[in-house]
Amino acid sequence: MENCIVQEITYIDEYIELCEIASKSNHPNASNYNVDKMKKRWNKYLIFTKLTRGNELISFAGIVDFGNNLVRVADRLYTKQEYRQNFMTKKVINPLRPAVDYIIPYHTQWAIDRGYDCFYSIQELKKRNSLIRTVKLLNPNLGYSVLPDLYATCNPKNPRCWQNIASTTKNIHLQSKPIL
């Protein structure tokens, strides 16, 4: 693993700076990091972290409480272009895997230490295989498994809210529907 550090963000000003970087990027979900929307979201985070190597930002994400002792880790995960896995191949090409090696393990351990069950999700059914691969790459002691259905991670009327989930528990209270 690279010499990287996960740091907790405690001030909204630094959080806003990170959102500005992501919202101006060519990230497929750049609009998710709209500064005004993210300012409103700040108080929903139990923690928000960034991954750096030296002074270089690599990735960031937060943990959101979903109620009933369940949290979403790696919420609004952003990774700089040069550290992203850009192709849906079976082989992980980039040796630095920010989510798998740093963000998800750090968030999960933080949450488990406080008695939470965890999940992370990925949009779109066509990306389900990449979720399965990330679970295989994670330390098995974290306890993640891919759940069989799609789950509403936000408003169930919005098709983008129905997502694939990997979780440390099979007891998910989110609305679900079978994959057709």
Q: Can you say where each PLM-predicted feature lies in the sequence?
A:
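Alpha-helical elements of Rossmann-like donor-binding domains used by nucleotide-donor carbohydrate transfer enzymes
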Residues: 14-17, 21, 102, 106
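Conserved acetyl-CoA-binding loop-helix of GNAT-fold acetyltransferases
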Residues: 85-109
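A conserved beta-strand-loop-helix scaffold within acyl/acetyltransferase catalytic domains
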Residues: 20-81
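Conserved beta-strand-loop-alpha-helix junction that forms the acyl-donor binding cleft
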Residues: 120-133
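A short beta-loop-alpha structural element at the N-terminal edge
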Residues: 1-18
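Short, high-confidence coil segments that cap the C-terminus of an alpha-helix
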Residues: 46, 113-116
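Conserved catalytic-core motifs of GNAT/GCN5-like acyltransferases
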Residues: 122-123, 136-164
